[in-house]
Amino acid sequence: MLESHNDTAVAIAEHLGGSVSGFAAKMNQKAKLLGMSSTHFITPNGLDANGHYSTASDMCKLASYAIKNKDFLSLVQTKSHSFSDCSGKYHYSLTNHDAFLSYYEGALGIKTGFTGKAGYCFVGAAKKNGITLTSCVLASGWPPNKSFKWSDTKSLMDYGFFYFQKTPLPVQNLALAKIPVKDGKKKFVSLKPIIPKETLTASFDSLKIVYRIPTALCAPIRKNTPIGSISFYINNKLFQKTEVFPSESIEKSCFSDTIEQVLNQWMDIFCLS
C-alpha cells in the first residue's frame, strides 16, 4: 500500500482468490454489495485492462467502507515503515507517497494512483469537527502535473466542510401509533420506535420522508417481520430506507377468544346498567 507495489497486489490476489481472475470475481461481488453499480474489476492493482473501470462516486463508496476498518485506517495514515526479512540480514524502508497527509489539516489518507489512461488519481478522506468526508479525483492531470490531485482534493474537502453539516432526521415517534389488528388476540399493535439518525446535508438540500405504514393489519403478526418502511430522500434521490417493525407478536384469535370477548362485552354492559 505505501509503495503501490503492483506485484505484491497480484501475489495477494493469487493467494486469496486462487488466481487474479478469481480474486477479481470476489472484488466485483463486494463492489455490488457496496452499491458500486458503475464498477468492474479485472486487475487487483488498478492497472489498465479491457473491462476494468470505475467512477469517482463508486470509489468514494469504497473509501467510506474501507476507513471503517481500524487496521486499514492505521495503514493508510502510516507515513513510513521499516522492516527486515526473516533472516534479519536485509532491511527495508517504505515511504508513503500520500502527501495529502501533510498537506491538509485533518487528512486521513487514502491512496494515490496513476496509469497512462487514467492520469493522476487520488482517493482521499479527512475529518474535522466530527465529520468525515471522502473524495476522489480521476484524471487530475498528467506528467509533469503531479501535484494537481492535491489541490483538487483540497478544493473538494474545503467545499464539503464549508457547506455540509450533520442533520438529524426528523422521524415521527412511531411508538405512539396504534395499528388496528383484524382477527387477532389483541385489537391493536404499536410500532417499535426508530432512533433518529444523522446525515450530512447542505443548506440548499431538500429532505423528504415517505412513510409506508399500513392502516390495518391481519393476525398473525410477528415482531421480527417488517410491516412497513420509511424512505428518506435528499433532492428526490433515495439515500436510506428503514424497515418498520411491530412492537410485539400477536397470534390469530380462536373461537374461545371470540366467546371470551363477547362475554366481557356483556359484563361491561351489565355493570353499566
Where are these predicted regions, by residue range?
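Mid-bilayer segments of alpha-helical transmembrane spans in multi-pass integral membrane proteins
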Residues: 7-8
